[in-house]
C-alpha cells in the first residue's frame, strides 16, 4: 500500500551491469505516466504530508495519495526523535533520494477512499478489450526459447500449468514480458536456464551461457 521508489543509484546500477538505457532518469517519465496523484490537502500538509510535484504524474491509471491525517504534534515529536538518532527529514522519498524519514503517499483512491491495486488500475477499466485475455489460477513454469545461445537468446513463449493440471505453451507474437515481482521474476528465469549455473543446473535442463 505504501508508494515508494528505489534509490536512483540502485536503478542506475542496472545500466552499469549491462542493461543499457535503464537509469533513474529514463525510468522516471514512466513512473509519472502511471500515476494519478491526489495532491495533499492543506490539512494533510499541516499534519506532515509533503511531496515534490516534479516527480509525480496526475493523469495515469494508478491512484496515489495520502491517508487521512489530522494536525498534531506527532510529526514534530517524530522528527525530533529521528534527528537525535542521525536520521534526517527528507521532503519526498520518491525523488530517488530515500535516506531519511518522511510521511510518504500510499496507493489509494482518495476520492473513494479504497485501496488502489493492479486490478483497479490496469485490469477492470480494460477487461472488455478483445485483445486482452487473462488466465486465472495459472502457473508459469518456464520460458520457451527461440535460441539457446546466451548472446542471442530470445523468448518465444511460456510453458504454463492450468488450474486442472494441464501443461501447455502460450506463444508470443511479439515479445514475452516477465512481471512476476522481485522474488518470482528471478525464480522463473532460473527455472528457464538463466542465472548462476550453481543454482540453475539442478532446476533446468537448459542452461543459457
Regions found by a protein language model. Name each.
Residues 1-209:
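Structural core of flavin- and non-heme-iron oxidoreductases
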